[in-house]
Amino acid sequence: MKDILLITPPFTQLNTPYPATAYLKGFLNTKNISSFQIDLGIEVIIELFSKEQFTKVFAHAEQKNTILTDNSKRIFALKESYLNTLDAVIAFLQGNNATFARQICTDGFLPQASRFQQLDDLHWAFGEMGLHDKAKHLATLYLEDLSDFIVECVDANFGFSRYAERLGRSANSFDEIYDSLHKELTYIDQITLALLHEKIAKLQPKLVCFSVPFPGNLYSAFRCAQYIKKNFPNIKIAMGGGFANTELRSVSDKRVFEFFDFITLDDGELPIELLINSFSNNMAKMPLFKRTFLLQNNKVVYSNNCNKPDYKQSEVGTPDYTDLYLNKYISVIEIANPMHSLWSDGRWNKLTMAHGCYWGKCTFCDISLDYIKIYEPIAATLLVDRMEELISKTGENGFHFVDEAAPPSLMKALALEIIKRKLIVTWWTNIRFEKNFTADLCFLLKASGCIAVSGGLEVASDRLLKLIDKGVTVTQVAQVTRNFTKANIMVHSYLMYGYPTQTEQETIDSLEMVRQLFQIGVLQSGFWHQFALT
């Protein structure tokens, strides 16, 4: 029996756990509150993409007579080839049987459908000897073909890193999600709920907490909560996470609380501690809540009657990945982009250098939210203590610092502490392209194990950067990216188009500016996002 069950609902990343539950478990350890965490997403994926389960997928599609497109007919015709190779491909992408890469790269070994029509120039992307990455790329296309079959023939909501995302994106109204929750279970629902039942029956938690980071996790969180309410009615259920923090700050539809007892906002440590303490005290007459929505007298109320401040970052403990199946995550290479591979290939321990953003002025960012406006850096010595603890527990020495924007002064202190302790680590993070990233600092960061940074060039126009209050100029960005590149640190830039008042000519000029930055070699990766007001 555990006090708390922490759940990440399907789906997030394939290659590494989303860090929220590990952060919370690390904190709960400091309070001697027993907890267990599960990443339902990776568990569903591993169950689904197996020879045994996919045999059922093919049979289900045939029985329902949904194999209608040329692509799905081709995949079904090749089903024996898929079933004979599926378990071996998954094992390879989990880091087992490295020699299988040579077989995967053999022409005609893997069955191929429409995804292979988009095949990059493999020699350009991987060279003569990049067999392992080439094999991962081919195996990824193979899985994407099977994913297409699921979407076309079995469950249209499926996606590797999201499920029923469209429903989550319409969160201004609960009607569509509510209606979907009263329809027949989908194929993925059935797998998800079977795994959930097994965990809850074994652990018997007092409180189940769903961390919902993205719209593509929302439906599954509600479906799981619905199942718990029906089958384990004595268990209390809470929701938090990035989606709640941004989209549910003014929730008022009481139907939401048919599924969840509580919705907590912003940092989750203190709100969860108060919830579990109130259960232990049999819900005292005046229970204390921190930034929590609940139903009282058939009305949605927001309760924030606890005066205790949130815990300092030095007090929340080291993230704890115990309970998660770290050896089951799948490393994939979807496209031949070096930065994209950091997001999807390999397992990273995740840490935060500083809570919030030290700049906190960009006009496109919701700087009213606590996780952005409350800036609190963590001492470099404590950060490296946590890194050493995670290395000893996970066996992995790769770190992704998931800051909004890591501060240069703290990055310098971190690098010096890593070098002082003679640690061999690999790390990367998000930054602002500001002038404090001198050539000397970049070489120091490289010496400590920094391999990549990502930051926002946004609209690549000085007028618009000033309007955004980004605090940088295009010239400054070019100089800083040059400093990183000279130190052999890869640079990825987030780019934006369609910003209010941006003219057609400014858009063309920004494209040309980015092209030149790539041409001179100071940017190695970039991604354009269309500006959207939410």
Feature annotation, model-predicted:
Residues F11-L14, P19-Q53, Y82-L131, L138-Y142, ...:
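Glycine-rich beta-alpha loop elements in corrinoid/cobalamin-binding modules
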Residues Q37-F49, A244-D253, M411, R463-I468, ...:
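Flexible glycine/acidic-rich beta-alpha junction loops that bind and position SAM and/or redox cofactors
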Residues K229-I235, A284, I419-I424, F518-V522:
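Short helix-capping segments at alpha-helix termini
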Residues W343-T381:
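Canonical Radical SAM [4Fe-4S] cluster-binding loop centered on the CxxxCxxC motif
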